[in-house]
Structure formats: structure tokens, C-alpha cells
A protein has these predicted regions:
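A structural signal for well-ordered alpha-helical scaffolds and beta->alpha junctions
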Residues: 23, 50, 54, 93-96, ...
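Fe(II)/2-oxoglutarate
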Residues: 1-38, 243-252
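A structural signal for short, well-ordered beta-strand segments and their strand-loop junctions
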Residues: 44, 122-125, 131, 200-201, ...
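Proline-centered turn/helix-capping motifs that create local helix->coil transitions or kinks
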Residues: 65-67, 119-122, 167-171
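Non-heme Fe(II)/2-oxoglutarate
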Residues: 31-115
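Non-heme Fe(II) oxygenase catalytic core, chiefly the N-lobe of the double-stranded beta-helix
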Residues: 59-62, 91-95, 100-156
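Catalytic core of Fe(II)/2-oxoglutarate
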Residues: 2-7, 149-159, 167-252
Length: 252
């Protein structure tokens, strides 16, 4: 039994890949702004994948009627759809699944490490709490600081990446990502969820953010985002000393 799912016709690979060269240039260009941003380190990069690719990804983003969504409706977050990773993104278009894989790949990790200065970043192939998110009309996400640990892998949360897929998004619809200062006295940055915009944010227990006002987009539209979280491991005093390969003695 094959572990792969193949479509009919000639074998075809993904139609896009993230360029390590371009990503490094972007990281060097933006790392100063990332480190000095207020209220906490973050950066906004527009035109990340290019309009043609971004529009194509937006066109295959799962609609609100997709059976695999899990809907959240409570005080902190309402009319928000997510959790497609519970089914390993079954039924999600291959281009979006490939984007998620690219966000976990070497070129993107190198980009994040150069941009932020955080070394040894570890992606989450299970996309716990991340993956694809869709907020519908009337939905919101209250101000919050993100969870700080991956309990399953004993890792510390370091970065959040958000990539928006909302063509023709209008400011009157709301949905701006708000970044608030540590004592919650004021909003210091607002980031509209427009098409092809990448946001990278540092994690912190006082890094308050959300989109707390109810969305006023038309029925049939939603606030679509791709999210990925990144972690680091903590050194253990019980860890053995590092060594290279141990070669067995030659047998006579």
C-alpha cells in the first residue's frame, strides 16, 4: 500500500518554492526594523510571495462550508474557524499544504533566524493552534498573549508567523491585528490583514495582540490567515557531550 496520494495524470511537483537567496536579502533588509519595533519586536513584509501566487492561494483557501473546520464561539473568540490540522489538512488544496511545508523548511527557518537573531528555531509539523484560520463576519479574537510552551515536545515558543490571504480587503471591514503595550494602556500598532502580507512577531507573556472588534466584512467573506509557530529547545544539564560520528574499528 502506497503512503502517497497521487492525482491522475503525469507526476507533477509543486509549482513554487521559497528562494533562500531572496529570503536572506529580506531578512537583512528588515532585521533592524524588527528589533526596534514597538510595542514588541515584529515586522510586516508586503508582497511576500507576489500577487499572482498569493491570489492563487487565496482562491483555493477553504471556504466557510468546509466540513473539516472546527468553529469557536465564546467570549474570547467568536465565529473563528480552524483546527484543520486535526485531519492532517485532509482535503486542503495541495498548494496550501505545500506552503505550510515551506514554512517549516530550511530556507524559511534560516530567514527567521537571520531576521530575529533567534538561533536553533524548531518548526511545529503538527501546527498545534496554527495552520489555517478563517474568521467570519461578526467574529473577533480578544487581546491575548500566546501560549508559551509546546507541552508535547518540551519546547519554548519564540515566534509567531502570520500570512494573510484576503484580496480586496477594505479597511471599513476591520480585522486589523492590534499590538498593545505591556500594561494594556494603548494600542501601538495596527496591521491590516491584506493580501500577501507576512507578519513575524516575537513571543512574550506581555505581548498582547488580537483583533478584538467584530468583523464587518460582507457575508460570504472572511479573514483568512496562515499561521505558523516556532520554538527553541532548552539545554539540559543531563545531555551528553556532543561528538561526531563514532566509527567502528575495521574488521580484519
Amino acid at each position: 500500500v502506497s503512503a502517497a496520494t497521487l492525482e491522475e495524470g503525469p507526476l507533477q511537483g509543486p509549482s513554487f518554492f521559497l528562494s533562500r537567496t531572496v529570503l536572506r536579502a529580506l531578512a537583512l533588509e528588515h532585521r533592524g526594523a524588527y528589533g526596534t519595533a514597538r510595542p514588541h519586536p515584529h515586522v510586516v513584509i508586503d508582497g511576500f510571495l507576489g500577487e499572482r501566487l498569493a491570489a492563487g492561494l487565496a482562491g483555493v483557501f477553504p471556504g466557510a462550508d468546509d466540513a473539516h473546520w472546527k468553529r469557536r464561539d465564546h467570549v474570547e473568540q467568536a465565529a473563528r474557524l480552524g483546527q484543520l490540522q486535526r485531519k492532517a489538512f485532509e482535503g486542503v488544496h495541495g498548494a496550501l499544504r505545500h506552503l505550510l511545508s515551506e514554512f517549516s523548511g530550511m530556507s524559511f527557518i534560516d530567514f527567521l533566524e537571520t531576521l530575529t537573531g533567534v538561533q536553533g528555531l524548531i518548526p511545529d509539523p503538527h501546527f498545534r493552534g496554527a495552520g489555517l484560520h478563517l474568521t467570519l463576519r461578526g467574529g473577533h479574537l480578544a487581546l491575548h498573549a500566546d501560549f508559551n510552551r509546546d507541552r508535547f515536545r518540551a519546547l519554548s515558543r519564540r515566534l509567531t508567523v502570520l500570512y494573510y490571504l484576503n484580496p480586496g480587503w477594505e479597511s471599513a471591514w476591520g480585522g486589523d491585528l492590534e499590538l498593545w503595550n505591556a500594561d494594556l494602556s494603548r494600542c501601538e500598532a495596527r496591521i491590516a490583514p491584506v493580501l500577501d502580507r507576512l507578519v513575524v512577531m516575537a513571543h512574550g507573556d506581555n505581548h498582547w495582540h488580537g483583533h478584538p472588534a467584530a468583523l464587518e466584512c460582507p457575508e460570504g467573506r472572511g479573514r483568512a490567515a496562515v499561521a505558523a509557530y516556532f520554538y527553541t529547545a532548552e539545554a539540559s544539564p543531563d545531555a551528553p557531550e556532543a561528538h561526531s560520528a563514532l566509527w567502528a574499528p575495521a574488521r580484519s
